[in-house]
């Protein structure tokens, strides 16, 4: 049976710009917003868009990510005719199959894709925060009779040189692609979201592999190849909230935007929920000295200090006399008595000992997973 569209989430990047936060886990597994991991947004978008088959392409430090996704039940992707498949590099008779780039990762999983037998493939990045109806993008792809549709976001001209820029005609057909141009001709930035006709993409990838032509990356190789070949390539304009959280600063900003009164992500929209694998935790406990304002405090937290404009993830502790301001405290982290945290991201299971001060006024500070800052006490 032919499935209409298969989603493939690229989740194998190392995420070196997130520093300590990705030393032991893949970037899409990094926590966000108190109860989510970054990949939850792509998975939830798939579920809400009616996509029933999803492949997650992993490579770097996949254990936490694999455990989080499980069988896909948290996103309703564990039915008879639906499912999530974890796609990791493996050795084959022809040798090593380590992924060399985004499109190469797709080529290496041709057998899996063929087994699903889709008419279209949706390529997604696993490290962006946004809500999108992929079905609407697919309809645009069909209406344009396109071979490839690229989701684009209008960005300020001064920021356009940071992105792959799509130059289009009056009908939104892409006529030129520029990778991080010094002097951009337009402000339509690629979001790294693509819909391909599968057979056309498959034929191109197989031919490139046979001829040993480098075709490892969608932005650098595949899109230019499609344009040079005269394929019909169109832009799909997206106007909602979208954030690339590939740096410490952008991850911190996205978390702060998430708890802002405006909340452009519209996290409380019951018509488009963000799902996650949530463990059962006890209720929060607020001690006699607790003072919490303008903050998001998730299940299982213990607070006996001051928390302002911050996020406390599942099971975090802020002990007596501690102060947390403009910060993200990830699951299980402990902020000791009298400690002061400002503009920081504290990783899962980290311990900030009594009296320690972390000040990110000039630059957002990061404490890694299970890292101990200061001298931990027996209580920790």
UniProtKB/Swiss-Prot annotation:
InterPro entries: ADP-Glc_PPase (IPR011831), ADP_Glu_pyroP_CS (IPR005836), GlgC_bac (IPR023049), GlmU/GlgC-like_hexapep (IPR056818), NTP_transferase_dom (IPR005835), Nucleotide-diphossugar_trans (IPR029044), Trimer_LpxA-like_sf (IPR011004). Keywords: ATP-binding, Carbohydrate metabolism, Glycogen biosynthesis, Glycogen metabolism, Nucleotide-binding, Nucleotidyltransferase, Transferase. Pathway: Glycan biosynthesis; glycogen biosynthesis. GO terms for biological process: glycogen biosynthetic process. It catalyses: alpha-D-glucose 1-phosphate + ATP + H(+) = ADP-alpha-D-glucose + diphosphate. The keyword Nucleotidyltransferase applies. Belongs to the bacterial/plant glucose-1-phosphate adenylyltransferase family. This is Glucose-1-phosphate adenylyltransferase. The lineage of its organism: Bacteria, Bacillati, Bacillota, Bacilli, Lactobacillales.
